[in-house]
Design a protein with these regions (language model features):
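Long, compositionally biased intrinsically disordered regulatory segments in eukaryotic proteins
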Residues: 1-144
Length: 144
């Protein structure tokens, strides 16, 4: 992986979401895929930056994503929240699948971009490969 720019991170995220959600997935399946992808990434990131670090990056990601996707702040149901990504998942479930896909890709690109800023590109690349190995099965994915 040579450059983890926003576009490259977004492509990786969209590939992971598509793999987890399956073909022609609806918004609920996409939201579940986003939750699973987040859990995978949080699992490999937490030993390095701590759960508090993961939560802080998630909070900052949500704040930044709300600029482009203001609907991410609407329709809160706190009693159902389980973890810092719950608000995003809840909101993704209520969107058109194309909109949910676009937003989820942007959310993951933002989260991983913040991770690059925080721990550097080489270490982030290693974490992404560990969290989402299927996204890197095709070497051309890394270089395009």
């Amino acid at each position: 992986m040579t450059a983890l720019g926003h576009a490259a991170l977004r492509r990786i995220a969209l590939k992971v979401l598509a793999q987890h959600a399956g073909p022609a997935a609806g918004a609920e399946a996409l939201a579940a895929a986003a939750h699973r992808a987040y859990d995978d990434l949080a699992r490999v990131s937490a030993p390095l930056i701590g759960q508090v670090g993961v939560d802080a990056l998630t909070g900052r990601t949500l704040y930044l994503a709300q600029r482009k996707y203001p609907w991410l702040v609407h329709a809160r149901e706190p009693e159902q929240w389980k973890g810092p990504l719950a608000q995003i998942v809840f909101c993704l479930e209520r969107q058109d699948p194309a909109v949910a896909t676009e937003a989820a890709g942007a959310v993951f690109a933002t989260f991983t971009g913040l991770l690059v800023t925080f721990i550097g590109e080489p270490l982030t690349a290693r974490l992404l490969r560990k969290a989402w190995p299927d996204a890197f099965a095709d070497a051309s994915t890394e270089e395009t």
